[in-house]
A protein has these predicted regions:
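Active-site region of the double-stranded beta-helix
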Residues: 13-175, 183-211
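Conserved beta-strand-loop-short alpha-helix elements that form
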Residues: 178
């Protein structure tokens, strides 16, 4: 882990039921039934985005509203979803057992022919399970924004100076993909798609053991 991206076709079949349209509808239902619905005392943290920019619209509170946003080529992200679903919480706990550290689960809803975010990188290790539809992932090693220059507001336009080789992977339902921390990536939805993204910030000793 930590050296290069790695795709595993067909190895995420157990994750298919963790995020589908029914799960999305149930999670969004927390807006209606209040804090008690999720057992966490808070509503889902939902973002709406398009091509790397947040869109200032009310967050969807039903599957119907999600469909309406998708018809406008807008993507939806549910952050820290492990706080609102027992099975997603168990998934996060499983990752934390294997790779001790801070783990969060994000859920992505992306319409066909769109990119929710532009070229960017994450400070955490990213593991992706595709649960519905098809996505193309484009990945490059980050040689222009070294880790020792971390910033709260990273300059993603630096990708224009990147000269590392371009890698790609097409994910269909049931596939896994690992993207190392701080590697550039761009995601394009070929079909309407649902995916689970597990972000892990490992403790330093764990990185040394597994690196």
């Amino acid at each position: 882990m930590g050296r290069a991206p790695h795709a595993q076709p067909g190895t995420a079949s157990n994750a298919l039921g963790l995020f589908d349209w029914d799960v999305l509808e149930r999670l969004l239902g927390a807006f209606h039934s209040g804090p008690g619905n999720s057992g966490t005392g808070s509503e889902p943290d939902v973002l709406v985005a398009q091509r790397g920019r947040l869109v200032d619209v009310p967050p969807p509170r039903s599957l119907k509203e999600v469909r309406q946003l998708m018809a406008r080529s807008l993507g939806v992200v549910l952050r820290k979803a492990e706080r609102h679903d027992a099975r997603l919480a168990a998934l996060a706990e499983a990752f934390a057992r294997d790779l001790p550290g801070q783990v969060h689960v994000q859920l992505y809803v992306t319409p066909a022919g769109t990119q929710t975010f532009g070229w960017h990188y994450d400070d955490e290790e990213v593991f992706i399970a595709q649960t519905l539809g098809v996505k193309d992932y484009y990945i490059r090693e980050n040689t222009v924004a070294p880790a020792h220059r971390r910033s709260r507001q990273p300059d993603f336009s630096a990708v224009r100076r990147e000269t590392s080789p371009l890698l790609s992977a097409r994910l269909i339902a049931g596939d896994w993909l690992y993207i190392p921390a701080r590697w550039w990536h761009l995601v394009s939805s070929v079909e309407d798609a649902l995916s689970i993204s597990i972000g892990v910030v490992p403790r330093a000793p764990a990185l040394r053991r597994q690196g």
